[in-house]
């Protein structure tokens, strides 16, 4: 039975600032051009859910703070503050300010919350650090913060909030892994971090990449703008994914050759994009944009160091009119997603992206009608689950908490299944936000995945 939100009480302790356990350099470090792609105050919070440790003598808050302090010796920029430079760009002042850490105690057991597997957004938001609004335009949140909440069963959650201008998802995961390794007794992290942001600084170009969509042609929804936005987590099991892929291959004509099949990401991305557009009832002649993050660390020449933890993503983009998206065979849309992803991996595209962002950052702020753009992020392969064991047990779940950058309509995240639901092994969880009036239609589209005929 779901826990009653009104009954959930969380007692907060005083915020402390965890500093590196050893002296670290006091310098100001510049960020890369790609680091500046997100807004400087964009924070992405996630909640890691742990069952009660087998050794009940260990205090998870003490262990985490000790490990964090050790990890900050290697990741010392994360103990600093973001500052605006005279040229308008953001840098990180490595001033040893420390990482905000908040300890809390909940009045219930994790099982009463179903280990957040139902993903009640109101609960998830209480389990991450609440950043206060910036006081002026030159002040930004801390690069990272933690909130550890203990539950009556002995289990706990770790809410980690990271500034997207300092780390992308891969980088944040490596930082978390370093903390875990040190908490479990290692003397140093296996993967040593490197800064090297100069590798991704662009040049001014007179031929920037064109904006993929403009306000005049963007599709609009009668349901947007909306004040009543819902967040839902949909479970797509392994069998539904298999049937979807088989149906896509059947759509392809016998005369058409496919050197490789469709990936789970490509298949679900196209399906979710179309389902969302239908749910929003976008106008037929308007254009809709699917934009998704593409990890390019290994596609640079030479590849970035494994220890690089800054933003290293470009974006795949597909633009169709609503009529095309609604009426084309789904396999055609999946092919467009695959092609766009492959282009985003190329050295030429990576360079053009960086140079365009350096020359004209506004080009990446897509002008759109309400609901025209779906921004999709794939977290399945970041590595947050399951190999993040603090020496007790693996995490049972990991979920996003929609604060700040997540708190707008138009975002979708693909997640790995939780360890709480064995039936979802090999499946995908789809986290999405929509106006309340549009959610029933989207649910109908997602339910249809279960009855697709291969």
UniProtKB/Swiss-Prot annotation:
It is an enzyme of class 2 (transferase). GO terms for biological process: alkaloid biosynthetic process. Disrupting the production of quinolizidine type antinutritional alkaloids (QAs) by selecting inactive tetrahydroanabasine acetyltransferase variants is a potential kick-start for the domestication of novel legume crops. Pfam families: Transferase (PF02458). Changing residue 35 to E: Lost activity leading to sweet plants producing reduced levels of quinolizidine alkaloids (QAs). The keyword Transferase applies. This is Tetrahydroanabasine acetyltransferase.
């Amino acid at each position: 039975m779901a826990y009653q939100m009104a009954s959930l009480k969380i007692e907060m302790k005083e915020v402390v600032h965890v500093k590196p356990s050893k002296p670290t350099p006091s310098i100001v470090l510049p960020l890369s051009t790609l680091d500046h792609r997100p807004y400087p105050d964009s924070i992405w919070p996630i909640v890691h859910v742990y069952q009660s440790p087998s050794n009940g003598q260990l205090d998870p808050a003490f262990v985490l703070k000790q490990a964090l302090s050790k990890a900050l010796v290697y990741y010392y920029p994360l103990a600093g503050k973001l500052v605006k430079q005279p040229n308008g760009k953001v840098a990180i002042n490595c001033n040893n300010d420390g990482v905000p850490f908040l300890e809390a105690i909940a009045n219930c057991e994790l099982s009463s919350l179903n280990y957040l597997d139902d993903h009640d957004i109101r609960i998830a938001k209480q389990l991450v650090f609440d950043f206060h609004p910036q006081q002026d335009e030159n002040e930004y949140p801390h690069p990272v913060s933690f909130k550890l909440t203990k539950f009556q069963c002995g289990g706990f959650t770790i809410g980690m909030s990271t500034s997207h201008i300092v780390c992308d998802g891969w980088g944040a995961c490596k930082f978390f892994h370093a903390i875990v390794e040190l908490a479990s007794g290692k003397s140093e992290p296996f993967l040593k971090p490197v800064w090297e942001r100069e590798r991704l600084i662009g040049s001014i170009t007179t031929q920037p990449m064109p904006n993929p969509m403009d306000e005049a042609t963007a599709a609009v929804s009668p349901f947007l703008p909306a004040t009543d936005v819902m967040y839902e987590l949909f479970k797509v099991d392994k069998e539904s994914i298999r049937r979807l892929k088989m149906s896509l291959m059947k759509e392809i004509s016998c005369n058409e050759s496919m050197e490789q099949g469709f990936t789970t990401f490509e298949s679900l991305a196209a399906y979710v994009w179309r389902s969302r557009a239908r749910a929003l009832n976008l106008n037929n002649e308007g254009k809709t944009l699917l934009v998704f993050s593409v990890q390019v660390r290994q596609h640079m020449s030479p590849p970035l160091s494994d220890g690089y933890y800054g933003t290293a993503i470009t974006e795949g983009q597909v633009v169709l009119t609503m009529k095309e998206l609604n009426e084309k065979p789904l396999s055609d849309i999946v092919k467009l997603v695959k092609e766009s992803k492959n282009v985003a991996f190329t050295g030429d595209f990576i360079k053009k992206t960086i140079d365009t962002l350096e020359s004209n950052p506004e080009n990446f702020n897509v002008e759109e009608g309400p609901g025209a753009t779906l921004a999709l992020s794939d977290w399945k392969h970041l590595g947050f689950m399951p190999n993040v064991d603090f020496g007790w047990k693996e995490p049972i779940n990991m979920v996003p908490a929609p604060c700040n950058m997540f708190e707008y309509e138009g975002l979708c995240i693909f997640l790995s299944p939780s360890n709480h639901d064995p039936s979802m092994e090999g499946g995908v969880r789809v986290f999405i936000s929509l106006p309340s009036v549009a959610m029933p239609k989207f649910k109908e589209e997602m339910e249809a995945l279960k009855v697709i005929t291969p």
